[in-house]
């Protein structure tokens, strides 16, 4: 471990004003580093004075590679911090810039599903499960209806279950209906639309329904791992990363009016396509192999992350700095 001197980290990510708000992982990463008293550097001419390079936008690898070699700096990649690192092809999510990703020193991922995705993409660089240790309740979500703790959002106890519902503004009413039909289950509705709900639009407070804004990155890893099920209400949100995280954690997926998009979904998890009505969704939830509605006492779904994998991200950075850099 290095000394307690202030770390200087070069953060390589795409700074495009029209994309502000799309990459909450980048925003969270900046907040996290600052909370650990890390100095963030973004000017390329100052790379020499930095301790390590964090590569978020993969296509910027060519801009930092030369300086990393010249000044003997390690490059740690965080590929899931930028949606621009991926593209969709025939309903599958494809990783771009694989060649550059295989030339960095370390790749940090947040979930086992992300790790499996990289392995399937033929990424051979050493991979580390490196959790951002800052809890959910310390993250700022200005559009949430209310500020709740991490446990209230995604916590699972022996007598309750939580179901993550992915949808857009128009499908929020379905989530409300589901919450009314299953009062003993906590529903977390994640709004993935571009036009978000306003506080005044929600006229009824449902105790077991929470509202959150965000794309994939807003689903804190332990949220997927500890959920009883993931319900996808929008056909265009068949995000393979979310699916892989659910598969890795043995969490069933319920998809509304969505055709088969890949054999890996069928092979890896309990996947059911259902009709669009709230009643149909409710009945399909009861049909899952592990029933999150009636089987509330079951612990089979609680795929918890092992303590020895809960590495603090800042310590991963420090350990990489003191390790000798090998030529690639």
Language-model features: where?
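Conserved acidic donor-binding segment of nucleotide-sugar-dependent glycosyltransferases
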Residues: 270-279, 287-292
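Conserved donor-binding/catalytic core segment of Leloir-type glycosyltransferases
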Residues: 157-173, 188
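C-terminal alpha-helical cap of glycosyltransferases
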Residues: 284-291, 304-328
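A short, active-site helix/loop in glycosyltransferases that binds the activated sugar's phosphate group
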Residues: 103-126
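Membrane-proximal helix-turn-helix segments that form the acceptor-binding/catalytic region
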Residues: 90-107
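Short hydrophobic beta-strand element within catalytic cores of glycosyltransferases
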Residues: 252-255
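Aromatic "clamp/platform" in nucleotide-sugar-dependent glycosyltransferases that forms part
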Residues: 234-236
């Amino acid at each position: 471990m290095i000394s307690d001197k202030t770390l200087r980290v070069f953060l390589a990510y795409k700074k495009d004003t029209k994309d502000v708000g799309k990459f909450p992982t980048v925003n969270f990463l900046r907040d996290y580093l600052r909370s650990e008293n890390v100095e963030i550097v973004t000017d390329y001419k100052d790379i020499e004075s930095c301790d390590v390079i964090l590569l978020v936008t993969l296509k910027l690898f060519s801009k930092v590679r030369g300086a990393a070699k010249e000044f003997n700096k390690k490059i740690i990649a965080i590929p899931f911090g930028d949606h621009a690192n991926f593209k969709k092809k025939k309903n599958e999510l494809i990783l771009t810039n694989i060649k550059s990703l295989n030339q960095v020193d370390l790749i940090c991922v947040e979930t086992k599903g992300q790790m499996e995705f990289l392995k399937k993409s033929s990424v051979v660089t050493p991979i580390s499960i490196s959790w951002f240790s800052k809890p959910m309740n310390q993250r700022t979500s200005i559009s949430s209806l209310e500020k709740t703790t991490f446990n209230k959002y995604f916590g699972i106890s022996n007598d309750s279950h939580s179901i993550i519902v992915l949808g857009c503004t128009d499908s929020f009413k379905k989530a409300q209906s589901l919450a009314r039909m299953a009062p003993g289950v906590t529903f977390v509705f994640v709004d993935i639309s571009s036009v978000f709900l306003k506080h005044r639009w929600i006229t009824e407070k449902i105790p077991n329904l929470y509202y959150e804004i965000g794309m994939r990155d807003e689903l804190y890893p332990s949220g997927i791992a500890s959920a009883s099920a993931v319900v996808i209400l929008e056909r265009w949100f068949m995000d393979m990363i979310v699916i892989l995280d659910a598969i890795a954690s043995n969490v069933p997926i319920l998809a509304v009016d969505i055709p088969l998009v890949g054999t890996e979904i069928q092979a890896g998890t309990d996947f059911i396509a259902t009709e669009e009505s709230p009643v149909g969704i409710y009945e399909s939830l009861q049909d899952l192999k592990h029933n999150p509605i009636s089987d509330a006492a079951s612990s089979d779904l609680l795929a918890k992350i092992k303590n020895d994998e809960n590495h603090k991200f800042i310590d991963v950075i420090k350990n990489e700095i003191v390790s000798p850099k090998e030529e690639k």
